[in-house]
Amino acid sequence: MAASESRRYVIVGNGFAGTTAAEHLRKHDPDCEIHLFGDEPYTLYNRISLPPMLRKQIPEAKVMIRDRAWHETNRIDLHLQTRVERIDTAARTAIAGGREYPYDALLIATGGRPNPAPAPGGTGAENVFNFQYLDETRAISERLESAKAAIAIGGSYIAYELAEAFASRKVEAHWVMRGPYALHRVLDDVAGEFVDAAAKADGVHMHYGAEVAEFVRSNGSVSHVRLKDGGTIAADCYGVGFGLTMNTEVLDGTEVEVSRNGILCNDRMETNVPGIFAAGDIADFYDPTLEMRYRMGTWNNAGAHGKVVALNMIGGSEPYHDVPEYSSLLFKGQTITQFGLSPELQPEIELVRKIDAGKGWYRSLFFWRDRLVGGIMLGKGNRAGKRKYVEAIKSKEPFPKPDREAMLDWTA
């Protein structure tokens, strides 16, 4: 590329990570050429607003973030409902719709797709849904208008958000999971009891150690699920939350290293192939603050990735230093907040916890190699101190065991 030519950037995936990267590429490289590809027919919308939309707490218009005019103003060539079929790393081109798009730097921000219903009969049924996209949210909401009962299946955050939404829509709500308590890969048993009490207080029927053996159909719809223990539960609407499969297929046949968690990249979000980057849910990246590799599917993490990766795509060397966070409603106006690592990501974590029955909240902090690396907060008004915890994580300061209990009372 001649010195006078503008740099060319291709971004595959127009979610929060990809669109944020495009925005910051334009900010830092005013004369560049940007092509942004997305599978859906929509410009960027706020995925963390889908649960409140499903609860009918906000209108759909509040979910949308960027329109076509914004892309035009920022001179971002937007290609919706357009799949990038493959990448030619030798020629440094992305191929989509029979056309080649040359790049000087390429970003893969394709995220993941929901795993299908985990038993026969669910896939393709008109009343069985995943909960990842705007169209799915519309379909579930429409189904709930006439539903009398709904079932959330899975022990994940997605299943929890479905169960919470079903309860808020005043249908008979069931939450079915294989685990011994909700969110068992993230929470301990004490926190699981807290969630159990909150769910039941909101009218949710909890089914632990329960696995769906079959979605039983009648005239195209599922009439009930049959459990492996022989029990049955009938409903009009079924929401499935069984994790994601990462969309790495665009890199098939390339030298880019991919793990079962996503695309391997360093602390600058660059892969083993120079000039190819990954960001958002799909990035299996090295975090220099927490000093380990992991994948984090949170909204704020995707945005932070987008900002950092843009700097590095234009030739910078900026490491990612943010701390991932997740926060959502937890039945009856309570909240669940998670920050940093969890035992699911680092099994060697040491935990300290506190329950305040009077205030109705639970709090746990996670330590690894004597450093604070994460935590969980449950209950009403139980987010005080979170910023201080995040700063402590970033500081890498060691905390001796005798000092850790007192940290549970941080409120500043």
PLM-predicted stretches and their roles:
Residues P398-A412:
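Cysteine/selenocysteine-centered motifs that mediate thiol-based redox chemistry or coordinate metal-sulfur cofactors
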Residues G124-S146, S218-R226, G231-V308:
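FAD-site-proximal beta/loop scaffold in flavoenzymes
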Residues D31-H35, L78-I95, Y101, R169-C265:
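A Rossmann-like FAD-binding core segment of flavoenzymes
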Residues G18, A159-Y160:
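N-terminal Rossmann-fold NAD(P) dinucleotide-binding loop
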Residues A2-V10, M64-I151, R226-D229, G239-G241, ...:
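FAD-binding core/adjacent interface of flavoenzyme oxidoreductases
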